[in-house]
Amino acid sequence: NPRPRLFRLPADRAIVNRMGFNNDGSAAVAERLARRADREHADVLLGINIGKTKAVPVEDAVEDHRLSTRRLARFADYLVVNVSSPNTPGLRDLQAVEPLRPILAGVRDEAADATGREVPILVKIAPDLADDDIAAVAGLVGELGLAGVVATNTTITRDGLRTDAREVEALGAGGLSGPVLRTRAVEVLRLLRTELDRDRTVISVGGVDSAADVEHRLSLGADLVQAYTAFVYEGPQWPGRVLADLAAGERS
């Protein structure tokens, strides 16, 4: 999407973004990952996110996902199917079970064909889904034998912000992230842990700002925790500080 496309809301430690899936495409990424495979640190776990290309019609979404999977699955320790970005027109419509089923099944099958192994597949969902729809996605994950769910992406709501509403409106469209997302992200985590079998993975993301947030998500059944907005505000040493705080908590 055209710039400007990323905005800070300092009063809320939040971000509004309408980045879109701006990248060089799966073919170029595959070339870079092939070079990485021969380098130091190639043993670091690598999760690869894929999503529908903006220019691809919704009716061609299955094949578009299969193409990305065909090119990238061999490099992935796990794959995430992102159908929840608010910045690609029509993408969130693919979260409904009927259009989502062939996409996820196609990615699963393509990954197995391309690698000769079972690549863990997760689906990334929006916080704006109704609880019934979240439960339906969880059911689909079980039905297709997928690894789990990443919850959640950014929200299109603007509720609970300290920043003046006129200032927020002037920024335009985009997904909102940061601490304001925490309450809903926790609600979705609780719901997924109820709906999914315990051997399915839940990666919790949204409003994670501290070691206490990480500990809380893990206590509610998250298997992994992700963060982004706090990284932007706190800088590249922030993850290390969180890990140090977690380790100190374990020692105490």
State what each model feature region is.
Residues N1-A42:
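A gly/proline- and charged-residue-enriched helix-loop-helix capping module
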Residues E63, L129-E143, R193-R198, V208-V225:
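Catalytic cores of alpha/beta
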